Amino acid sequence: FLDYGSGYSLLKAIDSLPPNTKNVTFVEGDLFYTEEDFTKIIESKKNVVSINKEPIYANKAVVLYLDTQQHIHYLYDTAHKALNIKEPFCAIFNSAQMWKFNDTNYLQRVRKRLTNEQEEGTNLELIDAYFRDLENGSIDIIPIETWYNCNTVKDYHHVYKFIKAHENN
């Protein structure tokens, strides 16, 4: 995990799925979101990709974009310097980094097709490969209303203030 991050955890989880597992929900561990938003993902009958309302900056965003065929792609710069989409696209979003995989047989096939280099990459290697060729009708793009990526102490302080402000509601 120390070398490969959450991608390694995702691969190990897929390798260990019990037979007849209906779906897999994968969420980055440093996120803050509401139960209401998470419930939208869980209750969806489709595969799910999530988006948030944050601006897209290369130093922190995971980009989800739709190519001209409406296929989903992900982009992230591990160096946090610049993002480069090398093809025409129809839409671009900031990913909320929460996914639901509704076809575990397909998920396992995608996992088995990954190269060693992809396995050592980010979790987006598998996620991009899974969602890229799915039919649009089988995917819900769910906006997450309350979302914070807690990468820094400052981010955690922001979330703490949010929680305190909403404690009595």
Q: What residues fall within each predicted segment?
A:
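A short acidic, often aromatic-flanked loop/helix-cap motif at beta-alpha or helix-coil junctions
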Residues: 1-5, 56-57, 82, 147-149
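Conserved N-terminal catalytic core of the sugar/cofactor nucleotidyltransferase
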Residues: 1-23
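Short, surface-exposed amphipathic charged segments that create phosphate/polyanion-binding patches used
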Residues: 7-14, 62-66, 154-160
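Alpha-helical elements of Rossmann-like donor-binding domains used by nucleotide-donor carbohydrate transfer enzymes
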Residues: 8-12, 40, 46, 129, ...
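Short beta-strand-to-loop acidic/aromatic patch adjacent to the donor-nucleotide binding site
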Residues: 21-32
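A general structural motif
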Residues: 21-22, 45, 136-138
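Conserved core of the sugar-phosphate nucleotidyltransferase
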Residues: 34-118
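Conserved alpha/beta core of the MobA/IspD/sugar-nucleotide pyrophosphorylase nucleotidyltransferase superfamily
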Residues: 89-169
